[in-house]
Amino acid sequence: MARFTIVLAVLFAAALVSASAHKTVVTTSVAEEGEEENQRGCEWESRQCQMRHCMQWMRSMRGQYEESFLRSAEANQGQFEHFRECCNELRDVKSHCRCEALRCMMRQMQQEYGMEQEMQQMQQMMQYLPRMCGMSYPTECRMRPIFA
């Protein structure tokens, strides 16, 4: 009976250790507007707003709100290529400047298109673009409402 109790205690302890070893911790880093102390150094970089592929990708995504989702394979291939290059452009921006660069791009898109509903949809995509590109910091950028 004592051996049975010991074996049962060992099995219980092993199950407890196994269960705690399989915990998953998900960390999300969000950069808020004005939160980064180093954003002052981003002014030059964000004023440039030279993220040509990101702009092209956003324009191609904009087309999905206007057209049917049934687009040609060639158009989808071009869209993917712009997305991939957009991620590369975003990686080239200093990590603490990425959100400001995305906000700058959103301001340009707003001047170009200005449609409230469409811009809100684009803004949601831009908020999560760092995560979509597989970046560890920031994983998302808070965007101020474009239309209030």
Curated annotation (Swiss-Prot):
It comes from Sesamum indicum (Oriental sesame). Seed storage protein. Residues 46-55, 48-57, 76-86 are annotated as: Immunodominant epitope. The mature protein consists of a small and a large chain linked by disulfide bonds. This is 2S seed storage protein 1. The keyword Ligase does not apply. InterPro entries: Bifun_inhib/LTP/seed_sf (IPR036312), Bifunc_inhib/LTP/seed_store (IPR016140), Napin/2SS/CON (IPR000617). GO terms for cellular component: endosperm protein body.
